[in-house]
Structures are given as C-alpha cells and as structure tokens.
A protein has these predicted regions:
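Structural alpha-helical segments in enzyme catalytic/regulatory domains
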Residues: 44-48
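Glycine-rich phosphate/oxyanion-binding loops and their immediately adjacent helices
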Residues: 2
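His/Asp/Glu-enriched, well-ordered alpha-helical/loop segment
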Residues: 5-28, 33, 38-42, 53-167
Length: 167
C-alpha cells in the first residue's frame, strides 16, 4: 500500500470491521509505506486506531529517479514521502523497517541508515518540506523489537533476553 489513498482505505476498512466486532488485540500492518497524507494520520488518530507501519526505507534510493521523471506530484515527494518522524511521534503508530530482497539489500542496518540520514543512493539528502529523519535508537528498534512485534514474534526474538533467539 504505497499510496495515500490505499492507506486511508485500509484504515477505514479497519474502523468498519472494529465497529462490527470490537476487539483490542487486533494487528493492522501497512507494508511498503511510502506516500501518506494528513487525512490518513488524522483518521487513524480521530478513530483511536492502532496501525503498524512497515517502511521500505530504501525507497530513498529511487526517490531522485521519481523526481527527475516527474512521476508524482511535487507535494508527494516533498511532503508525503516516508513520513517516518510523523509515525514515531504519534502513539497510534508503531514503526518497523523492512527489506524486500528484490528492492533493498537484506542488510537491516542499511534501512536504518536510510531512515536516519534520508539520503539517496548518491548520498544526496532528500528534500523534504518538513523534518522526517528518525534517530539511531528508533531505527535499531524498528529492525528488532518493533519488527518482531509486528509479526507477533516478540516472545521469540527482537530483543536481548534470556530464552530468545538471535535473528
């Protein structure tokens, strides 16, 4: 669900399902989080939903290509692109960073580097109209415990505790 409309549609569907069958133990995850808008964030917040965001931070490597090709309206690339700081600043969201083997090297720290620096593959800073960088600790959590929680595996791995697997 890379686009802003798909994310809002998913959030509305979640609200509809929870209205029909309320429960507290649900998990909703949005994969390939790329473009989002204020309407999505506001809807989630206003309806007190909880959404796990799984971002592919390596999208920053292809951002310049999108910009040069004019594939997206300018506001998509300067205001709505990988709003990771907005995610971590809002208690209605959890952030994990993932790696699609075909899109990004399967090196988790590469994703953290991208999320922390917001630099493309030519080491140029992404030109956002608002700050969307995250700190290193949040980035490490996003590839460890938050990634494990998203898949309901936090009892098995994701943190350094006795009895957990290193993975």
């Amino acid at each position: 669900s890379q686009g802003d409309l798909s994310q809002l549609t998913l959030a509305k569907k979640l609200k509809e399902l929870l209205d029909r069958a309320p429960r507290k133990d649900y998990k909703m995850s949005i994969q390939h989080f790329a473009f989002s808008n204020d309407e999505f964030f506001d809807f989630v917040r206003e309806n007190n939903l909880s959404v796990n965001i799984s971002a592919l931070a390596a999208y920053m490597d292809i951002w310049p290509m999108w910009e040069k090709a004019g594939l997206y309206p300018k506001h998509f690339l300067t205001q709505n692109f990988l709003r990771l700081k907005d995610v971590i600043d809002d208690s209605h969201f959890e952030l994990s960073i993932h790696s699609d083997a075909c899109n990004m090297p399967t090196r988790p720290l590469y994703g953290v580097y991208k999320a922390v620096t917001r630099r493309d593959d030519e080491d140029q800073e992404i030109s956002d109209s608002r700050v969307q960088t995250i700190d290193v600790v949040t980035g490490i959590r996003a590839i460890t415990i938050e990634a494990a929680k998203q898949n309901r595996n936090e009892e098995l791995f994701g943190s350094l505790e006795k009895g957990k697997r290193a993975s």
